[in-house]
Curated annotation (Swiss-Prot):
This is Porphobilinogen deaminase. It comes from Deinococcus deserti (strain DSM 17065 / CIP 109153 / LMG 22923 / VCD115). CDD domains: PBP2_EcHMBS_like. SUPFAM superfamilies: Periplasmic binding protein-like II, Porphobilinogen deaminase (hydroxymethylbilane synthase), C-terminal domain. Monomer. Pfam families: Porphobil_deam, Porphobil_deamC. The porphobilinogen subunits are added to the dipyrromethane group. It is an enzyme of class 2 (transferase). GO terms for cellular component: cytoplasm. The keyword Glycoprotein does not apply. Pathway: Porphyrin-containing compound metabolism; protoporphyrin-IX biosynthesis; coproporphyrinogen-III from 5-aminolevulinate: step 2/4. One of its GO terms (molecular function) is hydroxymethylbilane synthase activity. GO terms for biological process: protoporphyrinogen IX biosynthetic process.
Length: 311
């Protein structure tokens, strides 16, 4: 029996989504033994705020050690939250498969009487670790107190039970994958808050080259083409901006009636300025749509906002 070692971070969410991937792969390859290996990353060990890391321009915060394990042949497939994966892979690696995306939206969880973002009282304390969410909140509701909140899902939910936070904002996908959908009070629609590029999707990364064709074939068995088109548009937009996964950038692509619509957002960290635009086209031209939108927004001054977030 062939053995395939699947690498992942060791958080509750990372393990939940990796077990989901392995279950899908096992359905396609019942004669293969899949083994999960957990790997600690810099993001797991570093307690700095993501805002501080963004200012340093760090990339691969959550994935580098896992990619190193791939290159060193200690694992065969890596499972990542796609929003954490830089837009360029190291030489010798490739994204072999993107499974079907779950909900891309952000969600709000609040204390009694604080269940909707628009209804939060003036001065309410909202916790999030995301640079993008902080920039959005400061622009959308400058009257709110935006407070840093890092940690896994359980840690963040426990923090909400204390006195420091009135509400927190998380990715819907994490709560859905860890079977905590019932904790969600409000789904924040993309027309209000655009998610991170690739949010809600997973990436299966492998070594590239013909000697790895069989492993690539194993991973590709659960690839979803519709998700791939949407993700490609979002990530080409991010790449065209020259921004990383910790920049104050949002993007969301949808396909309806054979037309792909990509919305993009870039904001100042202090909420003083936002740029938002849309590009549409044939899903087959998803990469060009993303690049076109990036060019449009750079022409509107997006670069200055991205650069300021690094200072």
């Amino acid at each position: 029996m062939r053995t395939v070692t699947v690498g992942t971070r060791g958080s509750t969410l990372a393990l939940a989504q990796t077990r989901w991937v392995v279950a899908r792969l096992k359905e396609e390859w019942p004669d293969t033994d899949f083994r999960i290996q957990t790997i600690s990353t810099k993001g797991d060990r570093n307690r700095e705020s993501l805002e501080a890391m963004a200012q340093k321009g760090d990339k691969g915060f959550w994935v580098k050690e896992i990619e190193d394990a791939l290159l060193q042949k200690r694992i065969d497939i890596a499972v990542h939250s796609l929003k954490d994966l830089p837009t360029e892979q190291p030489e010798g690696l490739e994204v072999a498969s993107i499974p079907k995306r779950v909900d891309a939206r952000d969600v709000l969880i609040g204390k009694e009487g604080m269940k909707r973002l628009a209804d939060l009282p003036q001065g309410a304390r909202v916790g999030t670790s995301s640079v993008r969410r902080k920039a959005f909140l400061r622009a959308y509701r400058p009257d709110l107190q935006v407070i840093d909140l890092r940690g896994n899902i359980d840690t963040r939910l426990a923090a909400l039970a204390g006195d420091e936070y009135d509400a927190i904002i998380l990715a819907a996908a994490g709560l859905i994958r860890t079977e905590m959908r019932h904790r969600i009070d409000e789904f924040v629609e993309p027309d209000i808050l655009l998610p991170a590029p690739g949010q809600g999707a997973l990436a299966l990364e492998t070594r590239s080259g013909p000697e790895n064709d069989l492993t690539i074939e194993v991973a590709y068995a659960i690839h979803d083409h519709g998700t791939d088109d949407r993700i490609t548009a979002e990530r080409e937009f991010l790449a065209g901006l020259g921004a990383g996964c910790m920049a104050p950038v949002g993007a969301h692509a949808s396909i309806k009636g054979g037309v792909l619509t990509l919305e993009g957002w870039v904001g100042a960290l202090d909420g003083s300025k936002v740029i938002r635009a849309t590009s549409i086209g044939d899903p087959a031209e998803c990469a060009d749509i993303g690049a076109e939108l990036a060019g449009d927004m750079l022409g509107q001054g997006a670069q200055a906002l991205i650069d300021a977030a690094r200072e």
